Amino acid sequence: MALRFPRFSQGLAQDPTTRRIWFGIATAHDFESHDDITEERLYQNIFASHFGQLAIIFLWTSGNLFHVAWQGNFESWVQDPLHVRPIAHAIWDPHFGQPAVEAFTRGGAPGPVNIAYSGVYQWWYTIGLRTNEDLYTGALFLLFISAISLIAGWLHLQPKWKPSVSWFKNAESRLNHHLSGLFGVSSLAWTGHLVHVAIPASRGESVRWNNFLDVLPHPQGLGPLFTGQWNLYAQNPDSSSHLFGTSQGAGTAILTLLGGFHPQTQSLWLTDMAHHHLAIAFIFLIAGHMYRTNFGIGHSMKDLLDAHIPPGGRLGRGHKGLYDTINNSIHFQLGLALASLGVITSLVAQHMYSLPAYAFIAQDFTTQAALYTHHQYIAGFIMTGAFAHGAIFFIRDYNPEQNEDNVLARMLEHKEAIISHLSWASLFLGFHTLGLYVHNDVMLAFGTPEKQILIEPIFAQWIQSAHGKTSYGFDILLSSTSGPAFNAGRSIWLPGWLNAVNENSNSLFLTIGPGDFLVHHAIALGLHTTTLILVKGALDARGSKLMPDKKDFGYSFPCDGPGRGGTCDISAWDAFYLAVFWMLNTIGWVTFYWHWKHITLWQGNVSQFNESSTYLMGWLRDYLWLNSSQLINGYNPFGMNSLSVWAWMFLFGHLVWATGFMFLISWRGYWQELIETLAWAHERTPLANLIRWRDKPVALSIVQARLVGLAHFSVGYIFTYAAFLIASTSGKFG
């Protein structure tokens, strides 16, 4: 008999139904469950797939550069970044006739194009790229790196080049490589690029391979470094009248602590960023050398963790046993990595708009909105993934004997306290926040808006004041003009920071009021509820009072039959599934808040947000409905405009989202009956019955149907909001 898909599971390959195909796809990447897997092959497969992932990333970034160089308008954008709209790529085959061709021909292009809202133009401009040739060179280089990555992945699957399990489990060497080799060296290299290429470019000087060795990045070269006069590198920074990309008003400093923003570009000073990356490089180069590798000096991770036993005895045996638990569990490591990456991605979203690093990106409002939303959604998915793999760790990898009375075991032992506290916090936030919103709605409806309950966020305002915001009149720390911190800030460190905090032309410490207070607590509700579901899923993954033997059923199971009532929907997978809905809900509130606050800020009518955000009808009417009007009018009986593609995507997103409910509400029995009826009809229809199938058609499992429903819900939700966001912002600001 010929080998059938899936080759990695003989049991599935011999399944006579279509379950073979769907379960095969579902478990293709679950290497641990494959027939002939060994620990060594598991690690090697994952290692090789990392190179494949890198190849895809480099190919994708190469494609961005290539298409902008080929079909974009980078060189004309560079001449006037604030008024030329950056082109992402051409539209090959514009449908819907001449009106569409005219609507999408913009940015000085000869034909229909898509506008770039990704910020790549600003990024490339900031780091010193100026011509299409520069972009082509970058694209080719990244294509080369992509090919190298593919070759490396293939090479590490060959017998001679396969790393051993001991190599993968050498934690200290891995820390050395990742901290010093990847973070440290790459940060140092990036500092080098900023100092040698980007900063000269910002001052009108082009540094390329042909003059790279001739141009001194600083008039005194390496002299100050070797003589210990490092402060010379900070002297004579760019002036406040500096025109970015020219020598007008330019200085000679390369490593500064100015603080605040370049007045023209509204982005952080390049010399501050070079200084930052140099500091990061220094820290990580040291951090990577703290652990014992080949030379018998430095810390051993195992010794460190085993020594972490708090003397009071309140945490039992502390971190004893954790080294082997983490080092032998890929799911634990992946959970930690995803949790870290999720937090970092959300921080990227927050900092890209509040402390913009790229020249002129702060004035490209649609790009700001798109990047914030993009990074917050990605953070949400990554964070839910972290808890999913944490739960899989508890089911597949956790060994109670190895972890007796350590912090991990003790957390499992008092999980009831953790879960009930999260539940209490969620209930408190939910009832109080909704109560305030609904009270305010009723007051508005009865024509007595003055009876709203409006709470000033005084603690948050106090924190903003402590960081230098003076408008609240708190007179504390950095907002206290007589304090030592304020005076030091004026001269010694970050003199531009206090100006930036108190200017109204950026998004640093926006003025907040009762509307912000309410939506902050709505978001807190979403975060706590999502966390409750995810934490409960992981802590109950091995078993609960209701189902003590849960771990024997694996990560995802629908129920344990009709004999054990109430065992449906309690697998760790079900917790992940429910949490994703709450995560999307939360990110929705986060992005609605950010977008509405900023739209009113950019339009100069902040009072609209302040007055309408204190009750639910305000959000529905003055944010969602008001801003979707242009979108819904993207095409009409009289023709179409450049928002039509977003109008179509808005409709299509709703369709995909609604399709999700078909799978989420009607379950397996319905589909099984439908399939059997369709199969009966097929077999009795002339011509159609000439086509036969080897696998008996059966409905998806309950868990799979839920996944299909969840995927449609998520994709539709994001498509709908992406179209709304981009159309409503670009429709107002271009």
From Swiss-Prot:
Residues that hold [4Fe-4S] cluster according to the record: 559, 568
Gene Ontology molecular function: 4 iron, 4 sulfur cluster binding; chlorophyll binding; electron transfer activity; magnesium ion binding; oxidoreductase activity
Residues at which phylloquinone binds: 671
EC number, as in UniProt: 1.97.1.12
Membrane-protein topology: Multi-pass membrane protein
Compartment annotation: Plastid, Chloroplast thylakoid membrane
Domain of life: Eukaryota
Family the UniProt entry places it in: Belongs to the PsaA/PsaB family.
Protein name: Photosystem I P700 chlorophyll a apoprotein A2
